Structures are given as structure tokens and as C-alpha cells.
Amino acid sequence: MISDIKKILYATDLSPNSAHAFRYAVYFAKKFDAEIIILHVIEGASQDAVKALELYMDKQYLKKTLEKREDHAVERLKNRLRIFCDKELTDDPEFVEKIGSIEAYRGYPAEEILKKTEELNCDAIIMGTHKRSSTYTFLGTVAKRVLRRARKPVFIIPLPKGMTDLSFYDD
């Protein structure tokens, strides 16, 4: 039996083209009357990088700096969501209420996406691919790992050829 999709995890890398994959998350949320959880994972620094930083910063300052980075990612996501809604959801301003939460974590992206999908009881995962060149779209290692290990449906959204959508661009 196919289970209902009531909660969608939309994983974003904050690239300007991520609006295209978010459109699919919005489409599915409307179609299934589902909630969207927006997730961004900040790749953790390598152990070598952390050790090098600790030579120049005390651990408390380093911890605060990393926390600020997470807060900044959440603020960027909120700003992008506002821009997207203002631009593309003028006919449905109440849709914003379907956004359950905006989450940002440090870690390995594929592992965090899979972990949060289970923790938050999401029924599906939506994420985009990276554009590698004008001749083909590259399915990134994060998408491959999620696709291989997920126990929920995963929708990988390719970027159409030549598309450069700056709907999320906020820099």
C-alpha cells in the first residue's frame, strides 16, 4: 500500500538554482495537502581544519562562530522563502503556513538528510541536482547517497537545460 505524503523534507544547498526544486516541493505540498520542512546542512569542517582553527581561536569562540553560521543559513532560508512567496505565490499567500519549519544543521549532508527524515517523520524527500556543464546534469554524491539509503520516496529534481533561475538569489 502506498502511504500518504503528509510531510515533505525539502533539502537545499542554498544555490541560486535551488528555487526550481522548491517549486516541486510546493507543487507536491499543494497536491497532497502536505507540510514542508526546509533543511540545509552545513558540511562540517574536517578534523584537520578544526585543529588548525583551534590554534588561532579558543574553543568557545570557535563554537560561537559555527553557531552563527547556522543562524545565518536559517536567516538566508527565511529571506529566500519570503522572496519566493512574494514572487510566485501571490495567488496563495496562505501557503506559507504549510512550511512546518526551517532547519539548518552542521554535519554530513546525506547522513543529516536521512536522519532528519526519520526524526521528523517525513514521508518524502525532495532535492535538486547540481548543474555540472551545459551538456549534462550531474547527480551529486549527496543525492546519490540519499537515493541509495533512503527508506522513503526521494524525488531528485534536475535543472532544465539552460535554466538559471535566481528566484532564491539574495546575495
Residue ranges and their predicted role:
Residues M1-S3, I83-I125, K161-L166, D170-D171:
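Structural beta-alpha unit
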Residues I2-K64, D171:
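Small/aliphatic-rich secondary-structure junction motif
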Residues D4, K115-D165:
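Gly/Ser-rich helix-loop-strand patches that form or flank binding pockets
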Residues S18, R106, T135-Y136:
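A conditional alpha-helix N-cap/helix-loop micro-motif detector
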Residues Y24, A73-K87, E112:
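Short, solvent-exposed amphipathic alpha-helices that sit
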Residues K59-N79:
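A short acidic, glycine-rich active-site loop
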